[in-house]
């Protein structure tokens, strides 16, 4: 995920930002040049080089809390999450109300799977900067992972109010609405996501799953078929089709879809099908038992 701050500073042209430093020092101070280079390099996905520039800035000015946050984001982009948290903590020690550092710390903790702590820090981020749509989005995502769907719906609504083109926010809001069994609202929200990103296979999958919960099995199968057109290597879509066919007591189609599922992902879905109530109507059939109990496809 590319952060709002870095999207803003990526106006620097990379080729200009990494020009010979001594020639540029006449117009800007060395710290400004290095910071600009680091921001541009981050925006270009050159995170290690960005880290080097930010490190040089911090040698010159170890109290620059903004650069400590930039340093933290660069570390997070390199999956060095514990080190990134150290950088965000240094930023916050200097400026405790700096929203971007709270945001970064929460994001890093979420990446490490610490969703409770992540939600705590992301809440601080949106308190200090309520217009940070990415922070609202990341807060909602953490709340989804915690099963706090009512809270996450509110967070995604804030995120969408700031950026109405963020299909990820619509998608995750749809997931949360399913979590509280508001399936009609979920379907409308997923339609908005698909309007913005019609080839997002995972949104079609979620739409299909929602339609199954609504008992609209034919439409669900059509959604999974659309998903497969967008992404062929897509076991979740085949599994969704198997569920919908099973609810219609269509043994042959169920077995065909499960076969395709197990070819693509033989272990996880074989465990899931053993516990999935959608298949209970076919579970005692000998052919079904042979399919789910076969050790290998």
Predicted regions and their residues:
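Canonical positions in the second alpha-helix
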Residues: 24, 57, 90-91, 124-125, ...
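TPR/TPR-like (Sel1-like) alpha-helical repeat modules
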Residues: 246, 251-268, 296-297
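Terminal, low-structured helical/coil segments at or just beyond the last alpha-helical repeat
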Residues: 3, 12, 16-23, 28, ...
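Conserved alpha-helical positions within TPR/SEL1-like repeat arrays
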Residues: 35-43, 66-77, 100-111, 133-145, ...
């Amino acid at each position: 995920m590319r952060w709002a701050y870095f999207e803003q500073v990526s106006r620097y042209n990379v080729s200009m930002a990494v020009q010979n430093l001594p020639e540029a020092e006449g117009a800007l101070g060395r710290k400004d040049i290095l910071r600009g280079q680091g921001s541009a390099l981050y925006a270009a996905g050159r995170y290690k080089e960005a880290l080097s520039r930010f490190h040089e800035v911090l040698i010159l000015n170890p109290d620059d809390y903004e650069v400590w946050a930039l340093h933290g984001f660069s570390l997070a982009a390199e999956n060095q999450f514990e080190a990134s948290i150290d950088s965000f903590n240094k930023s916050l020690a200097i400026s405790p109300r700096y929203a971007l550092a709270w945001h970064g710390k929460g994001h890093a903790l979420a990446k490490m799977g610490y969703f409770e702590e992540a939600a705590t820090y992301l809440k601080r981020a949106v308190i200090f900067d309520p217009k940070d749509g990415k922070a609202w989005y990341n807060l909602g995502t953490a709340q989804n992972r915690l099963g706090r769907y009512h809270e996450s719906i509110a967070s995604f609504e804030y995120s969408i109010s700031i950026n109405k083109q963020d299909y990820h926010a619509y998608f995750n809001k749809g997931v949360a609405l399913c979590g509280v069994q508001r399936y009609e609202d979920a379907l409308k929200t997923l339609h908005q996501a698909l309007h913005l990103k019609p080839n997002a296979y995972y949104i079609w999958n979620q739409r299909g799953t929602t339609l199954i919960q609504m008992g609209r099995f034919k439409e669900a199968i059509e959604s999974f078929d659309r998903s497969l057109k967008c992404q062929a290597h897509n076991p979740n879509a085949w599994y969704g089709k198997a569920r919908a066919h099973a609810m219609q007591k269509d043994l042959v189609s169920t077995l065909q879809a499960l076969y395709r599922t197990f070819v693509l992902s033989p272990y996880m879905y074989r465990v899931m099908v053993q516990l999935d109530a959608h298949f209970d109507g076919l579970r005692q059939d000998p052919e079904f038992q042979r399919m789910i109990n076969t050790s290998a496809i």
